């Protein structure tokens, strides 16, 4: 800690930290700026016990319940990112932009993602403007336009905040924004739990919550260790190592899966159809029968773990790079055999990591169903995993940045 404090005084790291903190504070302030024309007291009382709104508030830090200008949060941008990243694996032009055109191609993909996020934010904002109609003082076309513009603009600001944090700050912007929104709800949760300690069952609830929190943290740290694969150079005969992580995607599969589960909730609030509402209730983490939700959530985490691993590591590219460096894996022929070996190894690691991640995400809900102890009301395992994962990723990025700065100073 002393070395971190000493190094943080160096030029660069302080600016990044201050920028990150400043943008996170601004993102929180926006949730308290209400959209005009809505009876916010009546609206809050009406939806305060709505489990779907409670789920949506995870991503907006309470902004959805108060209909602040940042009510949509980072969800439109995450949804757009999911669509574009899926498209890069199936649309040749996008795949070419990502792999062959370098930084210019990635910037074009980022621009496409922004436009898609803008469109999705406008659609969601329009839907919310119709949803709050019973609580609006003077609902007309002018109000619909004003609210759509306000929520869309707020979502675009959040998107810009996230990009600035990623590029010029510390950590992953979208992850940190979700992180700070979850943290914002902790004081209220702690107060509720403190006031509730009056019986053995309630004390047991806190013990289980603390135990699962520690359990989540330990498992999540363990599954992020590196898997070492030995390589040998042909001429110099030096031994080096190719690191493969058990969980390539980190916390992103959890965030992506949660973002997908938010979509039916949005539709359920806008489309007042009995079938849609029933489907939304079944896919809600607060539903009475969580079996369908748990199966769907488990499957989404598995899918996005494999999907994210395929984006981060391409076995064919790694094989070609090893061949160019005149290196090989002992006992494996260069070329296609190396590619197949890497793909097989990556699939096994991803499968184990995805199972760990999905299991830790759903086991608290299973325990809650069995014991009938509502341990995770307000702070589910998903939130715990996101908190732990983002904290680990951010601290690791700070350490990497400090090491690179020290190396640059030595070279100078």
Swiss-Prot record:
It is found in: Plastid, Chloroplast thylakoid membrane. Pfam families: SecY. SUPFAM superfamilies: Preprotein translocase SecY subunit. It is a multi-pass membrane protein. Keywords: Chloroplast, Membrane, Plastid, Protein transport, Thylakoid, Translocation, Transmembrane, Transmembrane helix, Transport. One of its GO terms (biological process) is protein transport. The keyword DNA damage does not apply. The keyword Membrane applies. The chain crosses the membrane at residues 17-37, 58-78, 117-137, 143-163, 170-190, 251-271, 293-313, 350-370, 372-392. GO terms for cellular component: chloroplast thylakoid membrane. InterPro entries: SecY, SecY/SEC61-alpha, SecY_CS, SecY_dom_sf. It comes from the Eukaryota. Component of the plastid Sec protein translocase complex, which is composed of at least SecY and SecE. Belongs to the SecY/SEC61-alpha family. The central subunit of the protein translocation channel SecYE. Consists of two halves formed by TMs 1-5 and 6-10. These two domains form a lateral gate at the front which open onto the bilayer between TMs 2 and 7, and are clamped together by SecE at the back. The channel is closed by both a pore ring composed of hydrophobic SecY resides and a short helix (helix 2A) on the extracellular side of the membrane which forms a plug. PANTHER family: SECY/SEC61-ALPHA FAMILY MEMBER. This is Protein translocase subunit SecY. It comes from Pyrenomonas salina. The gene is secY.
């Amino acid at each position: 800690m002393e070395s971190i404090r000493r190094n943080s005084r160096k030029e660069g790291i302080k600016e990044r930290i201050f920028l990150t903190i400043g943008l996170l504070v601004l993102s929180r302030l926006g949730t308290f700026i209400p959209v005009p024309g809505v009876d916010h007291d009546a609206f809050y009382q009406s939806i305060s016990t709505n489990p779907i709104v409670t789920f949506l508030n995870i991503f907006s830090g309470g902004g959805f319940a108060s209909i602040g200008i940042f009510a949509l949060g980072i969800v439109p941008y995450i949804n757009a990112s999911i669509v574009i990243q899926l498209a890069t694996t199936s649309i040749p032009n996008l795949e070419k932009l990502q792999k062959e055109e370098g930084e210019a191609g990635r910037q074009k993909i980022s621009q496409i993602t922004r436009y898609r996020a803008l469109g999705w934010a406008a659609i969601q904002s329009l839907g919310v403007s119709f949803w709050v109609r019973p609580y609006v003082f003077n609902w007309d076309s002018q109000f619909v336009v004003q609210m759509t513009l306000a929520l869309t603009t707020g979502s675009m600001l959040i998107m810009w905040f996230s990009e600035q944090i990623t590029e010029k700050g510390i950590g992953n912007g979208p992850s940190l924004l979700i992180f700070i929104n979850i943290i914002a709800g902790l004081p209220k949760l702690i107060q509720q739990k403190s006031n509730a300690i009056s019986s053995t069952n309630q004390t047991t609830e806190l013990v289980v919550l603390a135990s699962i929190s520690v359990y989540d943290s330990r498992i999540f740290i363990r599954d992020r260790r590196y898997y070492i694969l030995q390589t040998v150079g042909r001429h110099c005969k030096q031994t080096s190592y190719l690191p493969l992580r058990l969980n390539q995607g980190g916390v992103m599969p959890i965030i992506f899966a949660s973002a997908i589960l938010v979509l039916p909730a949005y539709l359920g609030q806008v489309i007042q159809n009995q079938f849609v509402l029933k489907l939304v209730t079944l896919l809600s983490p607060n539903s009475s029968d969580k079996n369908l939700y748990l199966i769907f959530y488990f499957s989404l985490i598995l899918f996005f773990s494999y999907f994210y691993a395929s984006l981060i590591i391409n076995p064919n590219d790694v094989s070609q790079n090893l061949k160019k460096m005149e290196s090989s894996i002992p006992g494996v022929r260069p070329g296609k055999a190396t590619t197949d070996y890497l793909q097989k190894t990556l699939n096994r690691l991803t499968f184990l990591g995805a199972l760990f991640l999905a299991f830790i995400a759903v086991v608290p809900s299973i325990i809650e169903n069995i014991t009938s102890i509502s341990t995770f009301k307000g702070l589910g395992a998903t939130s715990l995993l996101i908190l732990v994962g983002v904290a680990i990723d951010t601290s690791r990025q700070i350490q990497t940045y400090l090491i690179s700065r020290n190396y640059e100073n030595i070279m100078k």
